[in-house]
């Protein structure tokens, strides 16, 4: 039996971010967002998929993070999630497999310098339409799937079904 070794989040912020940047095609894909921010005087990086996140919820959460001072910043991710995140659905993740699965399924994940875990917030808003044959441009042969919205909406529809970091 082959056992897969799971990579854990370490204490080195730079190594964690480097691993995420190597695994997710942030530079190649327009809809995988990497947002750097300072929280309480410490570096942090957010990862999420454009088209899945409720913009209003992310704006409120990021605004609340801007008011955190260095003295207010908790020492660990678990305490941070309980005291500083004004959102209900929050998880503390320590395994990169779980982190990547969450990002690719539409949640926002962020790392804070000094924490040995990532924080995951479920601010998802799935596109509400199924992939159907378009009314115009009907095809006689081949696939019946068609996309008629913006490219961000269409890629979110595809990423909802295909959760793969190689999808660019």
Model-derived segments and spans:
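Membrane-embedded alpha-helical signal segments
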Residues: 1-168
